[in-house]
Amino acid sequence: MKLVDTSSWVEYLRGRESEAGDRVEVLVLSGEAAWCDMTLVELWHGVRGVKEKRELAEMESEIERVPVNEAVWRLASKLALRCREKGVTVPTSDIVIAACGAAHKLELEHCDGHFDDILPLAKAL
């Protein structure tokens, strides 16, 4: 299973010709795609039109949901501090998603450059 970040989900859901969208399609078809509640919040926040709403609602019952539990929040807090100490400025939502992946020992599928800065710090915790 692989935790898919919002950036890659958007590529897939909007049908863009991209490597990230192709990777997500493979994960979805193989049953290996997962998301967390933070990703869902971001997706619902950016959904456009009736078609996207319908697709996302249908997918919610099909895609594995990785819990954002107490361990994730504790790790996210540590990761936020580590980012601050290293001068890395990234959205809080990306910190939570990275912490979710790290806490559950899942690789993260993304096409968001913020994770190139966050993930090495998460692995060091």
Task: Describe each PLM feature range.
Residues 1-35, 44-58:
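Short, well-structured N-terminal submotif of metal-dependent ribonuclease cores
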Residues 50-54, 83-84, 124-125:
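Short, hinge-like loop/turn segments at secondary-structure boundaries
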Residues 30-31, 59-62, 86, 104, ...:
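Structured helix-beta-strand junction loops
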Residues 48, 78, 120-123:
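Short secondary-structure transition/capping segments
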Residues 19, 64-111:
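Active-site neighborhoods of divalent-metal-dependent phosphate/nucleic-acid chemistry enzymes
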Residues 1, 98-125:
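Acidic, PIN/NYN-like endoribonuclease modules and their adjacent C-terminal/linker elements
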